[in-house]
C-alpha cells in the first residue's frame, strides 16, 4: 500500500514487536482527497547526547537498566568540536530522569528536551508531505486506515482539505460565571 500524506500530528507508543517492547511513532495526516490515515513507523530508540562526560559517568550510564546503548561522537558544540556520548534508552519516558540526574551532575546535554515524536520527524528529515509505503495494519478501535511503513520519502507539497473544529468558553475566574460559549466548524 502506498499513500502520500500531509502530516498533521504525531505520537509515540510502546508496542511489543518481535517479542520485545519497542517505541514506535504514529504519524497522522490526510491525503490530497481528504482521507485521514495513520502511519506506524519502524521502531527507533529514544536518545540524547552528553557533552564530554567523565569516564566514571560513562560507566555509570552504561550500567543502568534503562540505557540501551551508548556510542562516542564528535560534535560541534559552542564553536568547537567536542567529544560527546550518544545515549540510547528503551523508552522516551526514561530520558527525563536521566537528563535531570546528568544535569544535577553539572553535565551539558544536547537534544534531551525534544519530545520523542518530534525527534523522529527531525531525525528522518520529514517535511510537511511524505509518501509512505507498507502493509495495511489492523488496529482495533482506530477510525482510520493504518499503514505499517517500510519506506518513507519526501513528497510534493499539497494542501489537504481539513475540517477544523474550534471550541471556546470564556468565563470569569472570580465567580465561575460563563460569559460566552462558542463553537464553529470550518470545512476547507
What does each of the following model-derived ranges do?
Residues 1-188:
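The two-metal-ion catalytic cores of nucleic-acid processing enzymes
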Amino acid at each position: 500500500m502506498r499513500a502520500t500524506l500531509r502530516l498533521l500530528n504525531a505520537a509515540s507508543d510502546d508496542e511489543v514487536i518481535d517479542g520485545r517492547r519497542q517505541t514506535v511513532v504514529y504519524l497522522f495526516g490526510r491525503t490530497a482527497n481528504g482521507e485521514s490515515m495513520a502511519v506506524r513507523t519502524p521502531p527507533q530508540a529514544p536518545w540524547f547526547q552528553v557533552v564530554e562526560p567523565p569516564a566514571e559517568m560513562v560507566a555509570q550510564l552504561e550500567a543502568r537498566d534503562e540505557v540501551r546503548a551508548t556510542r562516542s561522537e564528535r560534535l560541534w558544540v559552542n564553536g568547537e568540536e567536542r567529544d560527546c556520548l550518544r545515549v540510547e534508552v528503551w523508552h522516551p519516558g526514561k530520558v527525563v530522569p536521566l537528563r535531570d540526574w546528568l544535569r544535577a551532575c553539572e553535565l551539558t546535554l544536547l537534544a534531551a528536551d525534544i519530545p520523542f515524536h518530534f525527534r523522529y520527524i527531525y531525525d528522518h528529515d520529514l517535511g510537511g508531505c511524505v509518501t509512505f509505503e507498507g502493509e495495511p495494519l489492523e488496529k482495533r478501535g482506530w477510525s482510520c486506515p493504518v499503514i505499517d511503513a517500510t519506506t518513507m520519502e519526501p513528497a510534493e507539497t499539497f494542501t489537504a482539505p481539513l475540517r477544523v473544529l474550534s471550541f471556546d468558553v470564556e468565563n470569569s475566574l472570580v465567580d465561575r460565571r460563563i460569559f460566552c460559549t462558542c463553537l464553529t466548524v470550518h470545512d476547507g
